[in-house]
Structure formats: structure tokens, C-alpha cells
Amino acid sequence: MIGLLTLAVFVATFAVIYRWAEGSHLAVLAGAAALVVIGTISGSYTPVMALRSVYFETLALIFGMAAISALLARSGVYAYLAAGTAELSQGQGRWILVMMALVTYGISLASNSLVTVAVVVPVTLTVCFRTGIDPVPVIIAEIIAANLGGASTMIGDFPNMILASAGKLHFNDFIAGMMPVCLILLAVMLVFFERRLGDWKGSEIPVDPVWARGEALRHSAIDRRLLSYGLIIFGVTVAGLILAGPLKVRPGWIAFVAGVTALGLGRFKDDEFFSACGGTDILFYGGLFVMVGALTSVGILDWAVNWLEGITAAHDRVRAILLMWMAAAVTIFVGGGTSAAVFAPVAATLRLDGDGQAAWWALALGIMAGSVAALPGATAGSLAMTQYSGFVKRHPELASAAAAGLQFTHREYVRWGMPLMGIFLVLGTVYIAVLVG
């Protein structure tokens, strides 16, 4: 009975989040509080157990990398890179897509997808509308590239931070286990867009020439002092993460110290501090860990592990691949961070032959594949859609041009994302099969 009630609260919480994404951290905190109250009354989940279920190292990673990303973004370097890359494309639709996808991937290696998309999408919209190019395929490619970049490193996005803490993984493990396959998938994605768009050179939508002439691409001014601080802190942090294994120091605490330093040097205003340190994300994932702990305490995740082992018998390869596909399916609806928190305890129980970390890479690839399928699963999908609609509203003279191109809707995104999810899962299956051996 308690198990069913716990599961019902968990499902209800994410049903609320699905309808009210902006208040997701409040919904999760309310759900976590409800589960602690239920567990305390029933004796199945005490406040001490809830506290022990939190991956504090993950929260330290989120804090540290958010602060470093905020410092670099405040310096103007991200916007400068995006604008410079867009100008190098010389107004050719194909090159705008390729180059903006590559710079998005590069930024996402160290910054979460929300920061990356917040920087590159406004630049993309200005360049595309100025040159008469439909921006929707470019933005979709950027969202997917951001997910691939985030999946490539331990510090790129929230799911990998969770997996790093749960699996006691290090920075170098992700570079060796995830980056090579993600680079292959990035190349596959670019080929997919190339083939699907065909002879796509630009001048696809009618743009008011008066607006196009007046809307110059503005280079962001770089604060060299902040940039110097940011690059030094980031460089020292990466060096520390690389050496964390030999030094027997957990990566989260290296990132935490770096984050405190970044906040101290970043000259953030009082109303910017909470955002700069990833406050909303820390609240969300802290509450989420408590909720997942409640599922574990009543045996729901143990049941899932036993079910997975039962249907796959002793076939390690099949078990890892099934975990990957299941994670992808769940991520479409609840997002990568939630899937990572839910499936991490499952992956931790899998003992596979061959590469001992294969279960973690299977889970990471499944989460990444699911995150590209639909906007609810994509970390920055909703933000990109909001930026697109806001840009068109601020420039009503672009309404006819936007209407002439592809419409940036959930359905349009799925037309691109769902086939790519299938391709990524097939290639990921081959990769995991080789690792498990």
C-alpha cells in the first residue's frame, strides 16, 4: 500500500511538472516533502534516510560548473564566439547550420544546455532572418548538438553529473567512454540534416529588406578581466578533474571550490547570485534525489532491477542494451536529469562482463538519445522555443517570413528528433555490444 502511494505521488509530481515546467523545482520540493511525511508516518522513509539519499557531490558539481559558466557568459566570450562563427558562414544556410552546431557542441562540453542555447539561439535568429534562411532547422540542430556536447563530458550537463556521483566515475572516464561515440553521433547528425535538407543554400523565406539592412549582427563586448578569471578558473578546474583519480579526490568538491572562487571574482549583482550558482537546479535535483530515495526505500527500484534481470536471464549485453532503450523512452517525457536519478540505482546493480563501466555508458547514451527525440526531453528545448516566439513577437515585420518557413512546434521538432533518436539508439546498441563483449 505504501509502495503504491509513493509511486502515485511520484507520478503526480511529474504530471504537474509536465503541465507547469517553470515551477518544476517547487513541484519536486513539494513531492519530496510529501514522501518524507508519508515515509515518516509509515516508518519506511525517515528524514535521515532522505538526507542520505541525496547525492551531495552532484549538487556540488552543479553549483561549481554553473558558477564557472555564469562567469564565462558574463565575460561575453560565448556570445562573441557565436557571432564570429555565424559571420564566418557567409550567409550560406548549410554552413550556418554546420558551424553553429559545432560551436554549440563545443560550448556544451563545459556549460549546461540552457546556458549554451541562451547564447547561440538569439545569434542564430538574427543571422538567419537577415539572410533569408529558415532558422528552424538550425535551431533544432543546435538543441541536438547541445545534448551531444553535454553527454560527452562529466561537466557538460546534469545527467552525467548524477551518473558521475552514483557510479564514482571521474572526468577521464567520460572522455574515454562517451566523447568518441558522441563525436561520431554528431557527424551522423550533420549528415542527416544535410541529406534531409537537400540543396539548401539560403534565401528560403521572404524577409523585409529594410529590417535585414538595419539588423546588424552585434558583437558582444568582451570583459577581458572576467574572461581571464574565467579561463584560469576553468583551466585549473579541468586540470583538477583530470588528476582527481590519482589524487583520490572526488570531482564534485574540486568543482565546488572553483565555483566559490568564480562567484567571488564574478562581480555578480545580488539578484544574480541565485541564478549564477544554479540555485533552481540545486533545489530541483535535491528534491528529486529525496523522491528517488523514497522509491528505493519501498522496494520499487529493487523490483525494477529484478524484472530487468529476469527477462534478460544471464545475457549481460542484452541487459545493458535494454537499460539504454528504457532510459531513452522515459527521458522523452520526463527529461534527462530525472531519468538519470531514477535509473542510476538500477545501473549501479548491473555487473557486466567486459568494460566494467558499460552500464553507465549505456544509461548515458539512452538518456542522450531520448533527450533529442522531443522538446520535453531536451534540456533546453522549451527555452529555444520561447526565444524563437519572443524574437518574432519583438519584430512583427518578420511574421510573414516566419510563417513562410517551418513552424517551430513540438510536432516539427519530433519530425527531426524522433528519427535521430532511432539512429542514435541503433549506433549506441552497437557500441555497447562491443564494450560488453
From Swiss-Prot:
It is found in: Magnetosome membrane. GO terms for biological process: monoatomic ion transport; transmembrane transport. Induction: Part of the probable 18 gene mamAB operon. GO terms for cellular component: magnetosome membrane. PANTHER family: P PROTEIN. Belongs to the arsenite-antimonite (ArsB) efflux (TC 2.A.45) family. This is Magnetosome protein MamN. It comes from Paramagnetospirillum magneticum (strain ATCC 700264 / AMB-1) (Magnetospirillum magneticum).
